[in-house]
């Protein structure tokens, strides 16, 4: 992560005097140059602001892991630029455009999906703003100097997402290699996950999430593997090919929804689809996208996270004879498993940690202080829920800084 972030920050940002300064370009238009300077389809100088928000959100996470201020400062610069350009939007325009010229500020173009190069529309719309919302949210929590502008941009984008994509299922483009319009599963299902993680902002969150999930199955469900009684997910409307990352993303969100709502409608297929997705990755980690070549980001990036989230939502899927952290409410900077001890450090004292363990621990400490096994609320505590094999350890409301240690 450090290598990737450092390389991009040194070789992929717009000029600080540009109309959109200090923003990461999504593509290297001179393929072997090692310099990111534009958009794969719309050319040199073109940014994708949604990817800038996603990159900055990952930089905040990296800052929390390393405590290196460089990543936080870079994330703040990107957030400042995004916030300054955020507008109200409407049914045809998102609060920030999908493509924009970093130097002139002009909105970029959508091109014909028939590879003619013909400009078909302005690239003023996408619904891939979940990471940007979380960027503003996390920077606000870090008490950033531009707190007010982050909060305002967060609210504007959130209200637009509620008013338009959530109602119309017009999710729009994401991928760099598609010239024109396409509705993408990643935009829709990532927002469904955002809703599940921010239920207080969505009074009808169950209906909202179910609506998105059903749209994805209706529009992008793939039935090629029906003989195995599993439906997997196509990538997008312009490229109706099943993807391992897209399928595992869908499954993880469906399992999160089931865990929080009690509605088990999607569980059986979700688990089968996760199993299907494993067949695209070899024992040594090679990933092969269906009917295509090796796409590294699809197999080594978000794909892995989907399985981690799936196991957190449905712990029975986690290995029963091993010890694993399934969930942390705070970013984990370090974790070590050794013999009769698990030791982890987090950015802030976590409200909740969840482990799948092979056997019940004898004790838990946080910051050197013993934490009691208790069902009482309002105190630091741990609870053991036995399973058929091993069990689930939940540690709650840790209010002291320092390492958490689980021992046997």
Residue spans for each PLM region:
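Glycan-recognition and catalytic cores of secretory/periplasmic carbohydrate-active enzymes
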Residues: 1-345
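Non-catalytic C-terminal accessory modules of carbohydrate-active enzymes
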Residues: 301-408
């Amino acid at each position: 992560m450090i290598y990737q972030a450092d390389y991009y920050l040194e070789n992929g940002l717009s000029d600080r005097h540009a109309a959109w300064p200090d923003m990461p370009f999504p593509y290297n238009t001179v393929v072997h140059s090692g310099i990111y300077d534009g958009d794969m389809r719309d050319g040199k100088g073109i940014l994708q602001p949604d990817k800038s928000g996603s990159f900055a959100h990952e930089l905040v996470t990296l800052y929390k892991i390393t405590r290196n201020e460089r990543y936080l400062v870079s994330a703040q610069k990107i957030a400042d630029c995004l916030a300054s350009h955020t507008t109200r939007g409407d049914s045809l325009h998102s609060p920030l455009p999908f493509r924009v010229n970093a130097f002139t500020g002009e909105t970029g173009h959508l091109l014909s999906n028939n590879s003619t190069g013909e400009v078909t529309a302005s690239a003023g719309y996408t619904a891939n703003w979940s990471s940007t919302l979380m960027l503003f949210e996390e920077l606000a929590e870090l008490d950033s100097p531009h707190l007010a502008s982050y909060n305002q941009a967060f609210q504007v984008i959130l209200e637009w997402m509620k008013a338009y994509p959530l109602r119309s299922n017009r999710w729009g483009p994401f991928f760099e290699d598609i010239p024109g319009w396409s509705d993408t599963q990643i935009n829709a299902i990532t927002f469904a996950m955002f809703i599940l993680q921010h239920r207080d902002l969505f009074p009808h969150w169950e209906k909202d999430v179910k609506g998105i999930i059903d749209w994805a199955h209706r529009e992008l469900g793939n039935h090629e593997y029906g003989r195995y009684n599993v439906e997997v997910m196509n990538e997008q409307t312009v490229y109706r090919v099943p993807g391992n990352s897209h399928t595992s993303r869908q499954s993880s969100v469906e399992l999160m929804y089931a865990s929080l709502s009690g509605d088990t409608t999607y569980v059986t297929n979700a688990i089968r689809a996760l199993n299907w997705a494993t067949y695209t990755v070899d024992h040594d980690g090679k990933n092969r996208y269906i009917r295509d070549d090796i796409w590294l980001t699809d197999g080594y990036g978000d794909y892995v996270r989907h399985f981690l989230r799936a196991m957190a939502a449905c712990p029975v899927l986690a290995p029963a004879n091993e010890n694993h952290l399934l969930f942390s409410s705070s970013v984990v900077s370090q974790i070590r498993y050794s013999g009769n001890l698990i030791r982890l450090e987090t950015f802030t004292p976590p409200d909740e940690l969840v482990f799948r363990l092979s056997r019940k621990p004898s004790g838990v400490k946080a910051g050197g202080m013993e934490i009691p096994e208790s069902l009482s609320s309002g105190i630091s505590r741990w609870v053991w829920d036995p399973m058929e094999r091993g069990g689930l350890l939940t540690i709650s409301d840790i209010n002291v800084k320092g390492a958490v240690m689980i021992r046997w």
